[in-house]
């Protein structure tokens, strides 16, 4: 390579010439010799990248460049390398699309060449094996002994000649005229019969002529015409003339006698049978019955045929009695021999009786011979004959299939005749995703895998014992680690980081096995097959042939959702193991004690084995080897038995499935649901609850939900089947499956709940759970030594007040929070860096590295930040000299702030980027407990107190709230994120701009301060003392309305249901993202422990975490920083509340049709119209729409506590007294909330209903109703009879009611009443009173003339579409969101701009999603079915 010439590693590299030619010219011999091992004869891309800017400099070059080479490596990966002056260093791969495409094609060509070479070698090997087998075949044929020809003895010749001569004597058979019966005078009997017939012959003839019909006359004419005109020499007559030669029995018998003497294995018996068949006159009819006989029954038949020669009737009688006597006297024989003998005797009886009938009627046995021969031919033609041979290898796998030469034409004809018929259906299309498949390559072989979630799923036998396997995707090779293998034949691999953007297959929520699809890669080709599947326990079977490489392939339904993982086949049927969501999570490892016990047992087994081996004689080794071989043979036999057992099970299931309709016992009507679980179809299922509807307004529905919705609509078109209420009711299920009438749970019971997954409480009968003796549990110390406390822990212990250590028996160690690197921009969404990011322990090294050397600064740094850099450098030098670094955080903060405002990178970020080596981003690791947990004191509800520090500067807490302290937390307090969704570029430009007054929420510290205003409007009075009569009336109305809550129960904490994908609050949120991660790490043990602690009398103070809600609101509120706050408590505290109130909440959701609370209510399927009609049916003249302001925050604490007490009075009496102190502690923490803000400040809230507690909506409903009852009595007096005509529906602060009377100045008086008495805010204009319900709104819908819902704020919906606060993942989600808006706009005017715009957008997105399975739009009929219900459920 000459100096200055471009360097090329190979001819393909020169031909493609990817990258920069200038970079190729910079290559030196040293750089060439140290090049990484790229694929031979492959191109590379050369780049000359600028490393940095040098200013000022004495030279002419301001830029420092480095050569970067990108290409495919020999290990199948794709990488980039930069030369640092000494060697090539790997960097993050640079994407060159042309290079990647070329490498993919080259890799495929190399793979095809390798396959061709291997195929040629295999072909040569197989040709050599064929030659060897041919030689072996010839040698074995020579070794086969040839049978010696049987010698013909003279005695058989003489015997055959004599019998043939006797048989061929004329008249030598039973029906010759010279033969008579011995016991019966046949001539006399026939003469008597003839005389009897000739009597009155003339009379008989006259009667016959008198009864001649027209058909008889026509038949006579036809016979005369045939006789006159049909030619005598017709070819049919010639054929029938020569056919009678088949009756030339004598010649045929002579030929059979010669053949019998020459070839028969029993010539004596066969010759006697020929002679007796001639003697009896049965002749040819005897021959087809011979295969049915044994030797004994053959001689019985010969004897009876000889008897038939002498006396016909005696022979027939004996023949009929022979099977009967044989059944009795031959019963001592074994089954097979017994059946053969009886079959021969029955054949003899049929021959003798049938032959006599034929001889008597026709004079010949030809008809009997034809019948027996036809039956044998049909039996032979319809018998199943193997159509192919299957060649298997040593493992039992089918290698090849060879068709047999014998083709049963009749069998195929009858089979095709059964299967033929008029086509009654068409095959369905199936959805496949080839991009979600990959090839798993291991040293043992190849298999197929597929992407699902964060894993690659394949069969466990494909992975084998390997810890790491190669994953081939689109020609590139990646390495993946085996994450988890459950007990099933399934393996889960960790998905490499570069493969995260690939397509994913989802698990089927509603499995449908009627049509399954198997997708796999075989020899780098995609193969697809569909078939019907049957379920056998945890496995599937289907008629699909398996080829090498298909193991681990996904078995999907017609929608492309995964049902099972393909395994292998055992012949005709393919097999797969069903995959469940629970299979993705590994079972929690056994505890340390269990591991130690297993280790002890293993050591004992080894010790016993060593003792036995020591006494074993060496000479026994050969027998051991033989035993080893016998064990291996038995394993093979067991394998074959297992395969046959599986095939027989599959065959039984298929036969039972086919015969089920015929075996079902019908007694006049169909039994619906008896003995099985099913859904109440007449009552229907709610499509959308109110919570789901509110979520629909913001996010829309995903693709799977829409497809299920459409399937539901199609299924409803035929109506719902009838059912009996008695069949649907299950006596064992009382509607509340977790708790019986007399069951109580004792939380003092010591139970091990250290499982990885939440489990339901045990289903018990009416028995009380007896607690075990209380034992003080001690932590197991496996380290056997006490570690020295860190300085941080000692400081925390010293600073802890004595009153904070309330629980002496629970020795806890303070947790040292995880210390993360300062992140000035990553968590502040573009605002100024958080102060705490810079306030860490500075030292001399930090000070030196915060500013680079002068020659490392860019020209832009000097121009924009020159003065500030000089100032900071002076501060750094002073800090190093004085060892006082207190001024550094503020100085660095100001410098980074100026850099950010000028568009430059912050200096603290530069230090992080420099010190952090480039890493290849991989999959996110699962959350787990920290290593330095100590005594795991973050489990307790008041663990936050141990971490509480003195208060600092107020930033987010208003001045009228106390500042209790500061907690270390790393959360943002700025958010100006307004995402820009590129998918919205597909939508047309809107002409209606009313949506622009809405937008996604953004905030700063002022928004947190502003959010506390929700608790203040006016101070309430002591209304219980001022208005006792009205409060008593409101209590009566509340008890009356919610009387269905009477005798509700407290449930076990492990039986509670809660959203586990929520933050676990502080301090658990430092280690776990969600409660689900916390449960996976620790199970239910902390929950039980804390409940027991409260039950015993402790009263820990719970910490709530506050954050602002990201949603679509008016831009005016965003400018005023008027953002709603949400608080959430520790999940243990929330689940304790669920123990006390979950049963009541569930009952409230079940009574939405008759009660006021509408939590769990669905406006779909006629639900909205039914609710509105319920208010109209009251017959009142007045309808009121009521809209509160700051409802949650202004609820008086006295009223909120009173409602909680009313709810508690509904609890079962025994449990009410038992858990009263737990309930009081729970309510006290609701009313006095210690709240943590993202700034680390801790304050105290004593007002309102917290928005994140377990029963927020339910409590708001009851407060709303109590206030309405108070309001009614305030204006109308406590008139209970008049109150019964009042009705209302509420959802939180939403209220729509009907009343019999309203005062004239109702709006002014009601606003004044709520302000002066309760301190609650109702703005003027928010109380609408009309004489018709039309035009009023409830839950975001306005009622139209047909009592149907119309969106109240379509401009807000349009803003959530065009100005979302969260980017949609793909185009399908955008189309699904538009379908949701089309559904919501079903009853809007056709020319409404929102509805027109949605239709226009659907036409745009539908063109891009023709193959997605989503509908282009919902039809009018579908929209009405969703809103109004099915044919038997239509409400309007």
Curated annotation (Swiss-Prot):
GO terms for biological process: DNA-templated transcription; proteolysis; viral RNA genome replication; viral translational frameshifting. The active site is at residues 461, 489, 551. Residues 104-142, 587-620 form a coiled coil. CDD domains: ps-ssRNAv_Astroviridae_RdRp. The keyword Hydrolase applies. Its EC number is 3.4.21.-, 2.7.7.48. Residues 756-828, 913-934 are annotated as: Disordered. Keywords: ATP-binding, Coiled coil, Covalent protein-RNA linkage, Host membrane, Hydrolase, Membrane, Nucleotide-binding, Nucleotidyltransferase, Phosphoprotein, Protease, RNA-directed RNA polymerase, Serine protease, Transferase, Transmembrane, Transmembrane helix, Viral RNA replication. Belongs to the astroviridae polyprotein 1AB family. This is Non-structural polyprotein 1AB. The lineage of its organism: Viruses, Riboviria, Orthornavirae, Pisuviricota, Stelpaviricetes. The gene is ORF1.
